[in-house]
Protein backbone atom coordinates (compact mmCIF):
# COMPACT_ATOMS: atom_id res chain seq x y z
CA UNK A 1 0.00 0.00 0.00
CA UNK A 2 1.25 3.47 -0.87
CA UNK A 3 0.86 5.83 2.09
CA UNK A 4 2.06 9.32 2.95
CA UNK A 5 1.55 12.07 5.51
CA UNK A 6 -1.70 14.00 5.33
CA UNK A 7 -1.19 17.71 4.57
CA UNK A 8 -1.32 20.16 7.46
CA UNK A 9 -4.24 21.85 5.67
CA UNK A 10 -6.51 18.80 6.12
CA UNK A 11 -9.52 18.96 8.39
CA UNK A 12 -8.85 15.49 9.80
CA UNK A 13 -5.68 13.91 11.18
CA UNK A 14 -3.17 16.52 10.00
CA UNK A 15 0.26 15.00 9.41
CA UNK A 16 -0.83 11.43 10.10
CA UNK A 17 -0.04 8.68 7.59
CA UNK A 18 -2.89 7.78 5.24
CA UNK A 19 -3.85 6.88 1.70
CA UNK A 20 -2.68 9.96 -0.24
CA UNK A 21 -5.70 10.87 -2.35
CA UNK A 22 -9.18 12.02 -1.47
CA UNK A 23 -11.78 14.36 -2.87
CA UNK A 24 -15.38 15.37 -2.48
CA UNK A 25 -17.84 14.52 -5.22
CA UNK A 26 -19.13 17.46 -7.20
CA UNK A 27 -22.87 18.01 -7.46
CA UNK A 28 -24.29 15.38 -9.84
CA UNK A 29 -20.94 13.62 -10.27
CA UNK A 30 -20.91 9.81 -10.20
CA UNK A 31 -18.50 7.85 -8.02
CA UNK A 32 -16.64 6.59 -11.08
CA UNK A 33 -16.33 10.08 -12.55
CA UNK A 34 -15.08 11.45 -9.22
CA UNK A 35 -12.48 8.68 -8.86
CA UNK A 36 -11.32 9.19 -12.46
CA UNK A 37 -11.10 12.98 -11.91
CA UNK A 38 -8.98 12.43 -8.81
CA UNK A 39 -6.63 10.07 -10.65
CA UNK A 40 -6.30 12.29 -13.73
CA UNK A 41 -5.45 15.28 -11.50
CA UNK A 42 -2.89 13.27 -9.52
CA UNK A 43 -1.38 11.44 -12.51
CA UNK A 44 -2.02 13.51 -15.66
CA UNK A 45 0.34 11.41 -17.82
CA UNK A 46 -1.07 8.02 -16.76
CA UNK A 47 -4.29 7.49 -18.68
CA UNK A 48 -4.44 3.72 -18.14
CA UNK A 49 -5.20 3.74 -14.38
CA UNK A 50 -8.49 2.06 -13.56
CA UNK A 51 -9.98 2.59 -10.10
CA UNK A 52 -11.83 -0.38 -8.59
CA UNK A 53 -14.52 0.29 -6.00
CA UNK A 54 -14.07 -1.79 -2.83
CA UNK A 55 -16.20 -0.48 0.03
CA UNK A 56 -18.30 2.38 1.31
CA UNK A 57 -18.80 3.17 4.97
CA UNK A 58 -20.07 5.91 7.23
CA UNK A 59 -17.40 7.79 9.16
CA UNK A 60 -18.28 10.20 11.92
CA UNK A 61 -16.28 11.83 14.67
CA UNK A 62 -16.28 15.19 16.47
CA UNK A 63 -14.99 16.99 13.36
CA UNK A 64 -16.86 15.42 10.46
CA UNK A 65 -19.70 13.23 9.29
CA UNK A 66 -19.12 11.68 5.88
CA UNK A 67 -19.74 8.70 3.67
CA UNK A 68 -16.44 7.25 2.45
CA UNK A 69 -16.12 5.38 -0.85
CA UNK A 70 -12.85 3.51 -1.07
CA UNK A 71 -11.28 2.61 -4.42
CA UNK A 72 -8.01 0.81 -5.15
CA UNK A 73 -5.78 1.11 -8.19
CA UNK A 74 -3.38 -1.57 -9.42
CA UNK A 75 -0.14 -0.12 -10.80
CA UNK A 76 2.39 -2.04 -12.81
CA UNK A 77 4.90 0.83 -12.64
CA UNK A 78 5.11 2.47 -9.24
CA UNK A 79 7.56 5.13 -10.49
CA UNK A 80 4.62 7.50 -11.06
CA UNK A 81 4.32 7.69 -7.27
CA UNK A 82 7.66 9.56 -7.15
CA UNK A 83 5.96 12.92 -7.31
CA UNK A 84 6.46 16.02 -5.13
CA UNK A 85 2.77 16.05 -4.16
CA UNK A 86 3.35 12.71 -2.38
CA UNK A 87 6.26 14.05 -0.33
CA UNK A 88 7.42 11.46 2.16
CA UNK A 89 5.22 8.79 0.59
CA UNK A 90 6.34 5.19 0.38
CA UNK A 91 5.12 1.68 -0.25
CA UNK A 92 4.32 -0.13 2.98
CA UNK A 93 4.20 -3.86 3.64
CA UNK A 94 1.38 -5.32 5.71
CA UNK A 95 3.91 -6.15 8.43
CA UNK A 96 5.12 -2.52 8.61
CA UNK A 97 1.55 -1.26 8.83
CA UNK A 98 0.54 -3.77 11.50
CA UNK A 99 3.57 -2.80 13.60
CA UNK A 100 2.24 0.80 13.72
CA UNK A 101 -1.51 0.18 14.04
CA UNK A 102 -3.10 1.48 17.21
CA UNK A 103 -0.25 3.91 17.96
CA UNK A 104 -1.96 7.05 16.56
CA UNK A 105 0.54 6.98 13.66
CA UNK A 106 -2.13 6.44 10.98
CA UNK A 107 -5.27 8.44 10.31
CA UNK A 108 -8.46 7.31 11.98
CA UNK A 109 -10.01 6.44 8.60
CA UNK A 110 -7.02 4.34 7.54
CA UNK A 111 -7.15 2.37 10.79
CA UNK A 112 -10.79 1.53 9.99
CA UNK A 113 -10.06 0.64 6.35
CA UNK A 114 -6.91 -1.40 6.81
CA UNK A 115 -8.31 -4.90 7.47
CA UNK A 116 -10.68 -4.58 4.52
CA UNK A 117 -7.88 -3.36 2.24
CA UNK A 118 -5.63 -6.20 3.36
CA UNK A 119 -8.32 -8.78 2.52
CA UNK A 120 -9.13 -7.22 -0.87
CA UNK A 121 -5.46 -7.00 -1.85
CA UNK A 122 -4.85 -10.58 -0.71
CA UNK A 123 -7.75 -11.90 -2.80
CA UNK A 124 -6.73 -9.84 -5.84
CA UNK A 125 -3.14 -11.08 -5.60
CA UNK A 126 -4.25 -14.69 -5.16
CA UNK A 127 -6.38 -14.63 -8.30
CA UNK A 128 -4.29 -12.23 -10.36
CA UNK A 129 -3.87 -13.32 -13.95
CA UNK A 130 -0.24 -13.06 -15.02
Where are these regions (language model features)?
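A generic short-segment signal for beta-strand/edge and adjacent turn/coil regions
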Residues: 36-43, 56-61
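Conserved Nudix-box catalytic region and its N-terminal flanking loop in Nudix hydrolases
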Residues: 1-40
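Nudix hydrolase/Nudix homology domain
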Residues: 15-17, 53-55, 62-130
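Short acidic/polar alpha-helix capping motifs at helix-coil junctions
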Residues: 2-3, 20, 42-44, 62, ...
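A short coil-to-beta-strand element that immediately follows conserved catalytic motifs
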Residues: 44-54
Amino acid sequence: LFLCNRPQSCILDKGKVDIPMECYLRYGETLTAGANRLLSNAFPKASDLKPTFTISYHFENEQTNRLVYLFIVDMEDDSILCDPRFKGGKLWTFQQIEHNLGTHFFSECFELEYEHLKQVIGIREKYKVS
